[in-house]
């Protein structure tokens, strides 16, 4: 393309470059005429006619100017070392929240700071629903999300409630059966006043009947269980079995006299001894003299028997002190005082009964008031004779009734 000659001149080239630069900067800058009249003013008029009028460019909006002034004030507080007032900080925080929502959008209900939980539109209402549109209309409990009706509905109620209150009070059935035996409790509670250890009787029934007498020194108020019929012996077996089970379970104390006096005693031997004595006592109780065959009214000098046994007292109902010797007499010096007390009481009782024992006839055949049936019973073989157990401590009188009728 051939260019005109005039455009090659330096002056023409300079004018062309200036006009092109002015035309390109018109939309962004406000051009002012260099002179009131001249070629440049006309060119500006032509450029303004060709391009629309450009609006003034403002660097900040009014809100940005206000925020800038606020930040400048906060900066002055920071430089001065004075705490920034909260009314200057709160608007900035709100502006940041609005900026986050503008750029990142509104968080959906299933996500965000609640980590998958949905926002409750009615916080004070029970949250029990059926999974659809229905929701409980009652108010929720203070410390729960549900009302009183729906609070425990989510738990499995098919099982029976566990009784936690009875758990610490429960005990093994064997221990419960042992604790229910009153003679054993009485025997365990009996203590001696001087020695300081528990004195368990060999026979729990005797210890239960004596009260506070225990097994040592209580010969004055001991009522023998062997003077009764087979019912008393069965009760003795039950009480002794309860004591054996109690000792086998470890309930007996370490100072139980049956096991710690001279070594461990066999339970089988002790049980066999009890059975033999019970059979012997049952045979003796069957051969007791009936109350009608030996009335006390016929013998006024035997009035002391009325004090011992009442109206129905017989010869066989006299206290059997021989079998009720203290079972713990092998203890030695610890029970010496108890033995002395028991022998003294037995001797006193023997002296009380002495005045009529000597007056009795030697042979049973000469006893008045005995019927033929009683006489036939008296002529029984000597193996089953009636043995009266008189205390051995009273050695100053002889037992005449212990002799057999055949030994005249």
UniProtKB/Swiss-Prot annotation:
Give the CC-aspect GO terms: nucleus
Q: Which InterPro entries match?
A: Gln-Leu-Gln_QLQ, GRF, WRC_dom
Query: Which positions fall inside the WRC domain?
Result: 120-164
**Keywords associated with the record:** Activator, Nucleus, Transcription, Transcription regulation
Tell me which residues make up the QLQ domain: 59-94
Superkingdom of origin: Eukaryota
Which SMART domains would you find in this protein's record? QLQ
Q: Name one GO biological process term.
A: leaf development
Its main localization is nucleus
Q: Where is the composition biased (Basic residues)?
A: 150-159
Span list, region Disordered: 139-178
* Compartments, as annotated in UniProt: Nucleus
Question: Where does this protein have compositionally biased stretches of type Low complexity?
Answer: 166-178
Keyword Endoplasmic reticulum (UniProt) = no
Tell me which Pfam families the record gives. QLQ (PF08880), WRC (PF08879)
Q: Which family does it belong to?
A: Belongs to the GRF family.
Put simply, this protein is called Growth-regulating factor 1
Query: Which species does the entry assign this protein to?
Result: Zea mays (Maize)
């Amino acid at each position: 393309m051939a260019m005109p000659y005039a455009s090659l001149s330096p002056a023409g080239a300079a004018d062309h470059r200036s006009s092109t630069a002015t035309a390109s900067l018109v939309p962004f800058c406000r051009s002012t005429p260099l002179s009131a009249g001249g070629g440049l003013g006309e060119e500006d008029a032509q450029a303004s006619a060709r391009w629309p009028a450009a609006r003034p460019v403002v660097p900040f909006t009014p809100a940005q100017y206000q925020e800038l002034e606020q930040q400048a004030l906060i900066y002055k507080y920071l430089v001065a070392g004075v705490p920034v007032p909260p009314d200057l900080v709160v608007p900035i925080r709100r502006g940041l929240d609005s900026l986050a929502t503008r750029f990142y959008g509104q968080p959906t209900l299933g996500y965000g700071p609640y980590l998958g939980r949905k926002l409750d539109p009615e916080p004070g209402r029970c949250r029990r629903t059926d999974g659809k549109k229905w929701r409980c209309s009652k108010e929720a409990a203070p410390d729960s999300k549900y009302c009183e009706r729906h609070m425990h509905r989510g738990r499995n109620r098919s099982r029976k409630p566990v009784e936690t209150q009875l758990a610490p009070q429960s005990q093994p059935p064997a221990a419960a059966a042992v604790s229910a035996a009153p003679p054993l409790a009485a025997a365990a509670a009996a203590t001696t006043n001087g020695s300081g250890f528990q004195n368990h009787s060999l026979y729990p029934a005797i210890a239960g009947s004596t009260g506070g007498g225990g097994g040592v020194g209580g010969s004055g108020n001991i009522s023998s269980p062997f003077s009764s019929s087979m019912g008393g012996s069965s009760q003795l077996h039950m009480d002794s079995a309860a004591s054996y089970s109690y000792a086998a379970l470890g309930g007996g104390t370490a100072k139980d006299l049956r096991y710690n006096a001279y070594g461990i005693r066999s339970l089988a031997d002790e049980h066999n001894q009890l059975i033999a004595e019970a059979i012997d006592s049952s045979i003796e109780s069957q051969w007791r003299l009936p109350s009608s065959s030996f009335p006390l009214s016929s013998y006024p000098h035997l009035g002391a028997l009325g004090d011992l046994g009442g109206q129905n007292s017989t010869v066989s109902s006299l206290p059997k002190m021989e079998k009720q010797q203290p079972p713990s007499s092998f203890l030695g010096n610890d029970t010496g005082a108890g033995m002395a007390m028991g022998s003294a009481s037995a001797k006193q009782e023997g002296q009380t009964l002495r005045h009529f024992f000597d007056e009795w006839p030697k042979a049973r055949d000469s006893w008045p008031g005995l019927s033929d049936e009683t006489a036939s019973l008296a002529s029984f073989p000597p193996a089953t004779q009636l043995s009266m157990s008189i205390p051995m401590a009273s050695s100053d009188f002889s037992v005449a009734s212990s002799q057999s009728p055949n030994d005249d």
